[in-house]
Amino acid sequence: MASWVGTELSALNPLRTLWLALAAAFLLALLLQLAPAGLLPNCALFQDLIRYGKTKLSGPRRPAVCRAFDVPKRYFSHFYVVSVLWNGFLLWFLSRSLFLGAPFPNWLRALLRTLGSTQFRALEMESKASQMLVGELALSAFLVLVFLWVHSVRRLFECFYISVFSNAVMHVVQYCFGLVYYVLVGLTVLSQVPMDDKNVYMLGKNLLLPARWFHVLGMMMFLWSSAHQYECHVILSNLRRNKKGAIVHCQHRIPFGDWFEYVSSANYLAELMIYISMAVTFGFHNFTWWLVVAYVFFCQALSAFFNHKFYKSTFVSYPKHRKAFLPFLF
């Protein structure tokens, strides 16, 4: 069993390589924005690819050719439609496999192995300790996939019934990446389920037997972070509504309340905390998922940096104590 764990921790499979590359790319983009003005050339196309929504307004002048690739920001809802359908599809397959022993379809099993799924062998399952460890991993992946699906359902609901979208835009490349993103995240979660040559590890009726304290902590953190993100989106929505809830304008205002008292992009901070809660659910030591968290951190930090810059340049009375993304730090 030790050899399996060591291999699982050390291998740089395609999924880890991809998430590492994405995290490094957004870290580099963030560092370039933090560099002193004039030190690096200001490429309009690069800026157009890393900004969306209101932050495009505070960026460099956009060439006409860039506007040809604009997609309405309200199409964010498409990301969550894809996620609800795709990850619901994966959750159905996983539930049947874990509790009924039904095998994954051949195409899905082959895809997961190509991406770098977690493997175990029957000879490694002889001891009770080994069975418990594999059961913990299987339960962790199941819970995280449930969290991901619930998160997507909530965000889809918010896009339709809470958020008030202006005529802001995003680049078509960002739109295409967003469509693929949740497909990739779902496959990443599913690849963490222990598999042998034919099937995933079956929990059967012993659903709660491998449950551990970090499963409970991860669930509590997920619910807490999700509640804060929902509240932040309600606050942003109310900035464009009257007391009766009717939309009266699509202009930008300074948000107050909840985590907005500390950071400009409280909803982005909540997003990061949601992904950290999933890392906790994996037992803190899932290297693949920490790479996903690293990507989310640098991606959200970059967007938060642009948001903070926009607010400070637009509103003279903007609270000076607020940070961009991390309370009291950044």
From Swiss-Prot:
Pathway assignment reads: Protein modification; protein glycosylation
Keywords recorded for this protein, A-Z: Endoplasmic reticulum, Lipid metabolism, Membrane, NADP, Oxidoreductase, Transmembrane, Transmembrane helix
Lipid bilayer topology: Multi-pass membrane protein
Checking Pfam families in the record gives: Steroid_dh (PF02544)
- What superkingdom heads the lineage? Eukaryota
EC number(s) on record?
A: 1.3.1.94, 1.3.1.22
Which top EC class is named for this enzyme in its record? oxidoreductase
Query: Which reaction equations make up its catalytic activity?
Result: a di-trans,poly-cis-dolichal + NADP(+) = a di-trans,poly-cis-polyprenal + NADPH + H(+); a 3-oxo-5alpha-steroid + NADP(+) = a 3-oxo-Delta(4)-steroid + NADPH + H(+); androst-4-ene-3,17-dione + NADPH + H(+) = 5alpha-androstan-3,17-dione + NADP(+); 17beta-hydroxy-5alpha-androstan-3-one + NADP(+) = testosterone + NADPH + H(+)
- Which InterPro entries does the entry mention? 3-oxo-5_a-steroid_4-DH_C, Dfg10/SRD5A3
Extract the PROSITE patterns matched here: S5A_REDUCTASE
Q: Which residues lie on this side of the membrane: Lumenal?
A: 41-74, 154-168, 228-277
Give Gene Ontology CC terms: endoplasmic reticulum; endoplasmic reticulum membrane
Q: Which residues lie on this side of the membrane: Cytoplasmic?
A: 1-19, 96-132, 190-206, 299-330
Where is it localised? Endoplasmic reticulum membrane
Q: Name its GO BP terms in alphabetical order.
A: dolichol biosynthetic process; dolichol metabolic process; dolichol-linked oligosaccharide biosynthetic process; polyprenol catabolic process
User: In Gene Ontology terms, what is one molecular function of this protein?
Assistant: polyprenal reductase activity
Q: Where are the transmembrane segments?
A: 20-40, 75-95, 133-153, 169-189, 207-227, 278-298
Family per UniProt? Belongs to the steroid 5-alpha reductase family. Polyprenal reductase subfamily.
Job description of the protein: Plays a key role in early steps of protein N-linked glycosylation by being involved in the conversion of polyprenol into dolichol. Acts as a polyprenal reductase that mediates the reduction of polyprenal into dolichal in a NADP-dependent mechanism. Dolichols are required for the synthesis of dolichol-linked monosaccharides and the oligosaccharide precursor used for N-glycosylation. Also able to convert testosterone (T) into 5-alpha-dihydrotestosterone (DHT).
Q: What protein does this entry describe?
A: Polyprenal reductase
Protein species of origin: Mesocricetus auratus (Golden hamster)
